[in-house]
Amino acid sequence: MNTPETPYVTTCPVGCTTTLADTALRLREGLLRRCGSCGQLLSSASAARYNETMAQFDDSAFNITTGSAQTRRDAVARKRLARIAGLLGKLPRDIRLCDVGCSRGQFVAAAVAEGFGAEGVEPAPQIAQAARDAGLPVRTGLLEDQQYADSCFDALTLFEVVEHLRTPLPLLTECRRVLKPGGILLISTGNAASWTAATMGARWDYFDMARDGGHISFFNPRSMEILAANAGFVVERIDTSRVKFHDRENTPRGRYAAGKLLAEALNLPARLLGRGHDMLAWLRKPAQ
């Protein structure tokens, strides 16, 4: 039984049996811990703290984007959708896709606009209702509770979901069940092995539960590969991108500008070496 002080996560979410060890990185919730086998980093947040920060997502006004921010988001979505179609070797109209943890359904909307047969699943009731109010086919609840048929989707997406999960393996196992043989699972999350994380340490915004509610589990390319294998997926590729060293709001203008120039110069090396702070894992359900 968890006490208020007991960490919500007590074992490696990837499935390793190695004892977790404290690191030197101290967050508001306590020291980050590391799995000695896969390098996964884990928050020391209690269940109460986790639930407190997760509450921000169940708000009908959450995650509204407009203007240039929405334009950039749509461009990213179109690029990802084009790659999904390319990996599947199908036209969008022949692809059934589900965005799991879809929030307001922005990616669902982008997929529908591109001709995909797209829908979403979102556990937060208010935000799921906001998506439906916008005319999007979004179900409320967990993927595991939807009772989808076996092998019914060509592609699934999990954008900024796995870092919230104490035990992600059941979700990935369900993803494998509902995907068709050869289907694609696309996962996005932060990269705890990035140059950004190494440089910023405890200042990395991805570690900040007050800013990014419920972030308790921090992946790296190796731990993502192990999780994928444990769930029965084949890794097509793992991409990382972007470097940053400072937060704009907490850094003097001159220092921020210099750091941004250096970060931009390192974007390509970070991408090539797997050290960018955004991670995108392209997984495939085996054809047999």
Regions found by a protein language model. Give the residues of each.
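Substrate-binding/catalytic lobe of Class I Rossmann-like enzymes that use SAM or dcSAM, i.e.
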Residues: 221-249
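Alpha-helical structural signal in soluble globular domains
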Residues: 110, 114, 174, 178, ...
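A short His-aromatic
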Residues: 160, 164
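Conserved N-terminal segment of class I S-adenosyl-L-methionine
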Residues: 1-159, 169-172, 239-243, 248-256, ...
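Short N-terminal helix/helix-N-cap motif within the alpha/beta-hydrolase-1
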Residues: 166-170, 197
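A short glycine-rich, Lys/Arg-flanked "PGG" loop and its adjoining helix->strand segment in the class I
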Residues: 169-184
